[in-house]
From Swiss-Prot:
Primary localization: mitochondrion
Family annotation (Pfam families): PET117
Keyword terms: Mitochondrion, Transit peptide
Source lineage: Eukaryota, Fungi, Dikarya, Ascomycota, Saccharomycotina
Superkingdom of the source species: Eukaryota
Record protein name field: Protein PET117, mitochondrial
Function noted in UniProt: Involved in the assembly of cytochrome c oxidase.
Amino acid sequence: MSRASKITFAASCLITAATVVGVHYVQEMERETLHQGPIKDAKRVEEKRLRKTNGVASLDPTKERKRYFNMSEHEEQKELRKKYETMQPLSGEVVTKDGEVVKESKK
């Protein structure tokens, strides 16, 4: 074999070996990452269960603020609904643009 063909063959073998080793390494990393998924999930579920048993007081301040805001917004919306129902009672009927009345079915 000529020198050029030997160099080409050696380079091809090195590139092939590097590719095989690289793919094997990536597969091992992915396998380890997939293995960590259920472990992290179990830890997250356990932390959530502990937070529930300890009550709402264990929430961080930003979550407490957001929860309080949502509760106050909900109360405000309930008051607005009562106010508007007194002004215009809800009948459960839907009137189309043709004037046809469609009753809603109870679920």
